[in-house]
């Protein structure tokens, strides 16, 4: 339903968005064989899958391994001259319950390819509990300092049955909280990056050459 509404607004000038959603692989009878938790790029061309969640929590209220298939690939998302690492929710929380560490794997790839990320983006639907906000901020700061770039955390807001999602999305740069959304309310944050100047620099160089 949401995508139908978005498709109705789709046009060549629409902004590019990153959306969290599910990807289904069906059998011939229409029964899901695999369900993946995915980050999509959505723009005037439609939906493009970018990244599949690697860590599937299977504790407390979570039973994701029963329903979902895990991803195995890192994702470095390039957009208008900027590079971003992508993570989904649990991927930022390596623990003894998991055999892989998506943050470490992403870091190793950017080091190997000599890439300086402009940000690490995490799309989350993270339930609230007492002390969770402080724990998130500490972990976000660790990741930001590891990569030397802002950590952009976006969280679901609202309720589902007895589960509460507190929103409170934020941007952390090093040890500093630079942007903060409201708790338990829908909110919009605007975070500006330096514009990519490559195309303008090329045009300027060409103009200088023509006019010299």
How would you label these PLM feature ranges?
Residues 1-212:
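Enzyme catalytic cores with a strong preference for nitrogen-chemistry domains
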């Amino acid at each position: 339903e949401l995508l139908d509404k978005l498709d109705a607004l789709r046009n060549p000038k629409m902004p590019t968005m990153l959306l969290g959603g599910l990807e289904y692989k069906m059998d011939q009878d229409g029964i899901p064989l695999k369900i993946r938790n995915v980050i999509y790029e959505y723009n005037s061309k439609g939906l493009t899958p970018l990244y599949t969640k690697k860590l599937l929590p299977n504790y407390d209220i979570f039973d994701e391994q029963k329903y979902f298939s895990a991803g195995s690939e890192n994702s470095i998302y390039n957009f208008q001259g900027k590079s971003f690492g992508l993570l989904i929710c649990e991927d930022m929380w390596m623990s003894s319950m998991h055999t892989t560490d998506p943050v470490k794997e992403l870091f190793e790839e950017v080091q190997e390819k000599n890439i300086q990320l402009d940000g690490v983006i995490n799309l989350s639907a993270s339930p609230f509990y007492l002390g969770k906000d402080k724990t998130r901020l500490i972990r976000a700061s660790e990741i930001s300092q590891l990569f030397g770039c802002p950590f952009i955390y976006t969280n679901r807001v609202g309720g589902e049955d007895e589960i509460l999602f507190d929103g409170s999305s934020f941007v952390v740069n090093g040890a500093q909280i630079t942007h903060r959304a409201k708790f338990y309310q829908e909110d919009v944050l605007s975070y500006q990056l330096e514009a990519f100047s490559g195309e303008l620099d090329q045009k300027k160089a060409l103009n200088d050459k023509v006019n010299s």
